Amino acid sequence: MVVIRLARGGAKARPFFNIVVADKRTRRDGRFIERLGFYNPIATANEESIRIAQDRLTYWRSVGAQASPTVERLISQAAKKAA
């Protein structure tokens, strides 16, 4: 099964997450199929905190990829910012 989830990056106490498409059986930060965007939880006011490639997200959902609950929340936040 293919899932859309967060892969952690960044330094200790400075998290940064990539939004990736990966096989469900791989490790959280392991190999992934495609990077769809990023989430920076500690972004300052003048930095971008969420970016998601909507066209690729739509494609992966159309072929059956399931998004994690956290990614679902981030998708809705990004949609509110875009509107």
Curated annotation (Swiss-Prot):
GO MF annotations in UniProt: structural constituent of ribosome
Keywords for this protein: Ribonucleoprotein, Ribosomal protein
One Pfam short name: Ribosomal_S16
Transit peptide in keyword set: no
SUPFAM superfamilies linked to this entry: Ribosomal protein S16
InterPro entries reported for this sequence: Ribosomal_bS16, Ribosomal_bS16_CS, Ribosomal_bS16_dom_sf
GO cellular component, one term: small ribosomal subunit
Keyword Hydrolase: no
PANTHER family documented for this protein: 30S RIBOSOMAL PROTEIN S16, SMALL RIBOSOMAL SUBUNIT PROTEIN BS16M
Full protein name: Small ribosomal subunit protein bS16
Organism: Albidiferax ferrireducens (strain ATCC BAA-621 / DSM 15236 / T118)
